Amino acid sequence: VISNSGEADLLDVLGVLGVPSEVDKGSRIGASLAPDALRKMTQQLDTKLPANGIDLGNLDVLGDWSSSLMELISHLVNVDVIPIVIGGTSDVANVILQALPDLPVVASMPLARHDLVERTENTVWLGLNGEQPIEVWDQINTRNMVWSTARQLDEQEAITIKAPKNAILWIDMSVIDLGHAAGTIGLNPGGIKPETLVSVVGAMDCNWKSIVITGL
């Protein structure tokens, strides 16, 4: 949404949407608190949305919220609004992927996922860390998907990250090194540094159609 002159392109409206879905059990209980907690934190830091940004509030997650979210995302993209969706559980991202099935994904997460590997368009992987499922790894190599480890990105090794022209950006916060994000779920020592992630994503020449953040 930033033009070559450095000014925001007001034709692209940013719509921030919270989806406070909750897990039934396990270490991610409390995920529903993330959207409002992030809003509170940004207010304390006196961080405001850009002029072309609007806060759409939180989606009502009672009942069949996934169908409602899918319809809303499709509508927003069709009217040239870029939805920035804050989960909630990883199910939130799954709905976004279903709503926009023909778009490639840039996925920043430590472990590769079957559903992302099996999409029609190749996924770009940022910050892979640890042992990957062998069958998933075979597909990544067979399809020549672009990938990088957290260490490669942090050490700025000579790797080429070719961004698709249009894509969905999915950031799962478990990709961040535990030392920089102690409140996130999932131990990831040796994960990517926050400033590295911002730098790498910011340098990608890509028209983001939707951004989804999970794992908060």
Q: Positions of the model-derived regions?
A:
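Conserved alpha-helical scaffold segments that buttress catalytic/binding sites
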Residues: 1-216
